Amino acid sequence: MKKLFTSESVGRGHPDKICDQISDAILDAYLTWDPHSKVAVETMVSGNNVFIAGEVKSKVTVDVIEIAKNVLRNIGYYSNNTSFITDIKSQSENIAMGVNLQDSDDLGAGDQGFMFGYATNETSQYMPLGITLCNKIVSRAGMLIKNQEFKDAKEDMKTQVTLDYSDPQNVKVDTIIFSCHHNEKYNETKFKNYIKTQILKPVLDEFNLELPERILINPTGKFVIGGPFSDTGLTGRKIIVDTYGGSARHGGGAFSGKDATKLDRSGAYMARWIAKNLVAANIADKIEVQIAYSIGVAKPVSVMVNTFGENKVPEDVVLDAILNNFELTPKGIIKSLNLNKPIYQKSSVYGHFGREDFQFTWESLDKVEAIREFVISKGFNI
């Protein structure tokens, strides 16, 4: 029996991803002028209608409608008939009491919750292979559309990759599904051949993988109606695409539209940074980290590390290495990862983790040596 595992990703024209990009573009606009802005913005798109709502506390105001228009124009789904409804309110005073101590070590979490971070040495990005392939496929397709090389294609797309792990030393691609919005008048044969030869094959070649026999391209036949005209989109509905493609657990909180006092986002970034540095330090082949918080409280209520039985040092030593080398309070996370900068729209498509096109702070490996030194000081060689 085959041992199969599947992951997926979506392009920047997918309705949910349109919303993520609008929400993060609005967040970036606030942070550009007031780095201490507290922002929680949600977007919904449906046909020619765009709804933007949320809570904000900032010294500045921004033109959220113009920001949304620019995002839609850039993707290719804006028209003069697009209408906008906005409802941006002030942040709740009850929440603000716990998170407005921006110069204090007592800066509390903006909400309760738990977050997971994960890393594996399966790829050079310290990411699972499946989600890495999916993100690279849709990213490459988007780049080719932008360069006007992928003819008749539009930005709403999805891909799904099934890997065969029957032989862990010889992982193979079992199935690829690729659905892409296209013009009504197009050459189907050329379109599908281009996808296979110019999108799928170059990505698989990068990982020394062969194209599978089963490749399903637009398996329903046509994909002429796309973007927000085919499906309603919402911010935060692609949380598995945003993270590890199902290879690791998820705390349930979405990222986009939230400033760094929302631990759903910054806590997940910190957990990823921890896990990646631990794996890079050769602590284990794969590691999952969980951090949990209470609203208004600075220190986490729990920290957990799971090495899946592949650890080279005891897990209690690994946990001590985390607690001694990483600042886990909201203020510590924001300062360590420099999260008050307008960097978030870049993260809103093609995955928040394992990215090579941007130097996100949570992807840095600047804690590897400190972790190694700590473990060695406890009497373990790695």
From Swiss-Prot:
Q: Which family does it belong to?
A: Belongs to the AdoMet synthase family.
Name of the featured protein:
S-adenosylmethionine synthase
Q: Which organism is it from?
A: Mycoplasmopsis synoviae (strain 53)
Disulphide-bridged cysteine pairs: none
Record: residues binding Mg(2+): D16
Primary localisation category: cytoplasm
What UniProt keywords apply to this chain's record, in alphabetical order? ATP-binding, Cytoplasm, Magnesium, Metal-binding, Nucleotide-binding, One-carbon metabolism, Potassium, Transferase
GO CC annotation, single: cytoplasm
